[in-house]
Amino acid sequence: MSRIAVMGSGAWGTAIALHLARQSEHELLLWSHSARVAESIRAFGENRDFLPGYPVPPALAVTVTADAEAALEFAEIIISVMPSHHVRHSYEQIFAPYLTPSHRILSATKGLEDATYLRMSQVISDVLLRRGLDLPLAVLGGPSFAQEVAAGSPTAVTVASKDAAFAGELQQVFSNGTLRLYTNDDVCGVEMGGALKNIIAIASGVVTGLGLGHNSTAAIITRGIAEMTRLAVACGGRRETLAGLAGLGDLVLTCTGSLSRNRTVGVELGKGRGLDDILAGLGGKVAEGVRTTAAALGLAASLGVEMPIAQQVHTVLQGQASPLQAMQYLMSRPGRDE
């Protein structure tokens, strides 16, 4: 039996908690940064703010709290599930006093830190090492809409860690008849796939919003995985990881699925709506690709990696080009070998 604290009560954190709660051998706690959200989940038996319509059955052992100290003192395994721009603050300002050498951490956040271009596991490691802690750390990646995981739809994802024993433990913790985990030791590749696919999903949405057709979508996905792979490999990831669940799998889902917030942002941009208006309409939910684009381009520039699709997504997000102008630019670039 594992004592698990899911730290983050957004859609993805709640879905993970619901999935794990179906396996009765775990003791499980869901932490929310918002006392109001925690109280709402307790009162209504579902997360009406971020994952409405997916009840927490009373028979399932999910304890919801806004008390970080209680959550971390309870936990053996910490599952870190919060927006990328909240990770450093959460670990430095909220979690740090309660972290101990006995903790093991799984990061389920996809993104890059704005100022440093660090992956989420690197951000967490940076905070831990400053406190003299070197904890087992793993990352979760792959095609996994929160709503479908919460509903128990068959899903396959990847867990990556340099600690093979911890990866194997997580594989056992998560795997059941509806969710299959593959293990990997390419932490960089898995995280880069999860972060970069959100940028390409915005581009795919733009194509849909402009009404440009399926050929254009296929081109964006295919050339998108090429530039994702270039940057991931330059950072130390493996090419084959980007061809797996954490790269191509997550990219296809996020570029084509109607539940993708990043794709939705692109669709609405393609239709002519302004970015601020689109983001306001997400109801507090986060489209990570909007923030990740600038960080990915900064990282790519530092490594001499060309990312033309990401660059055009950035110009559209910044209001420097219209969606149609960005697509026309991509189609008029000089010819090259594939």
Swiss-Prot record:
Classification via SUPFAM superfamilies: 6-phosphogluconate dehydrogenase C-terminal domain-like, NAD(P)-binding Rossmann-fold domains
Q: Which Gene3D superfamilies match?
A: N-(1-d-carboxylethyl)-l-norvaline Dehydrogenase, domain 2 (1.10.1040.10), NAD(P)-binding Rossmann-like Domain (3.40.50.720)
Q: What is its main location?
A: cytoplasm
Gene Ontology biological-process entries: carbohydrate metabolic process; glycerol-3-phosphate biosynthetic process; glycerol-3-phosphate catabolic process; glycerophospholipid metabolic process; phospholipid biosynthetic process
Alphabetical UniProt keywords: Cytoplasm, Lipid biosynthesis, Lipid metabolism, NAD, NADP, Nucleotide-binding, Oxidoreductase, Phospholipid biosynthesis, Phospholipid metabolism
Which residues does the Swiss-Prot or TrEMBL record annotate as the active site? 197 (proton acceptor)
- GO terms for cellular component: cytosol
Q: Which residues bind sn-glycerol 3-phosphate?
A: 110, 142, 144, 197, 250, 260-262
Pathway info: Membrane lipid metabolism; glycerophospholipid metabolism
Task: Tell me which PROSITE patterns the record gives.
Answer: NAD_G3PDH
- Molecular-function GO terms, alphabetical: glycerol-3-phosphate dehydrogenase [NAD(P)+] activity; NAD binding
What's the protein name? Glycerol-3-phosphate dehydrogenase [NAD(P)+]
Species for this entry = Acidobacterium capsulatum (strain ATCC 51196 / DSM 11244 / BCRC 80197 / JCM 7670 / NBRC 15755 / NCIMB 13165 / 161)
UniProt lineage: Bacteria, Pseudomonadati, Acidobacteriota, Terriglobia, Terriglobales
